[in-house]
């Protein structure tokens, strides 16, 4: 841990969309910081499909299957069982997409990934059959929008209420730092 002239938060909400490669890279750094600093990370959703939707086209929640949205619905269902499962799902599906070149946005690949995690592949169908998973993803997305956010990664440092919460877009990372370099970047981000 580095010496810091300010008190760093002990919790952060990390809003992500599985399809974003930069949010994925930043999430690797965030996990490093969480482990080194004892930081609590709440992995929350944000839809790049929705924010980039062309007028007249369907919203992601109006489609039977939607590229990033459906993967987040799976995460929403997992998060209800255990928030750590949403983190594990994001890491696994993000690694599959951005490192391994797999297509977790395809239902059959999502099922395979859940199996690889030791989870029931039927959770894909359960998440898609449950309309309230739309609500969970949409609520997280709209939270960021209401705070003036527009993309991922977005970090929110929760305050007593949304009015005093602090939001930061980024950092956008290509090569996430580790060790002391990860700590130094964290100090810069929270000191912003």
Question: Which residues are covered by each model-predicted region?
Answer:
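C-terminal cap of thioredoxin/glutaredoxin-like
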Residues: 28-34, 107-192
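Structural alpha/beta surface segment adjacent to cysteine/selenocysteine redox centers
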Residues: 13, 18, 24-110, 188, ...
């Amino acid at each position: 841990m580095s010496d810091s002239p300010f008190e760093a938060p002990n919790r952060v909400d990390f809003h992500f969309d599985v399809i974003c490669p930069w949010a994925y890279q930043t999430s690797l750094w965030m996990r490093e910081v969480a482990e080194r600093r004892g930081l609590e990370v709440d992995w929350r959703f944000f839809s790049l499909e929705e924010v980039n939707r062309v007028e007249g086209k369907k919203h992601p929640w109006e489609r039977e299957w939607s590229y990033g949205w459906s993967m987040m619905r799976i995460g929403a269902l997992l998060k209800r069982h255990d928030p750590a499962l949403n983190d594990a799902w994001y890491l696994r599906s993000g690694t599959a997409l951005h490192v391994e070149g797999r297509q977790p946005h395809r239902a059959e690949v999502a099922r395979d990934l859940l199996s690889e995690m030791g989870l029931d592949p039927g959770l894909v169908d359960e998440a898609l059959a449950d309309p309230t998973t739309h609500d969970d993803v949409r609520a997280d997305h709209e939270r960021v929008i209401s705070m003036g956010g527009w993309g991922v990664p977005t970090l929110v440092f929760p305050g007593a209420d949304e009015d005093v919460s602090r939001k930061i877009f980024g950092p956008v990372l290509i090569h996430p730092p580790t060790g002391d370099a990860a700590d130094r970047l964290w100090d810069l981000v929270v000191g912003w």
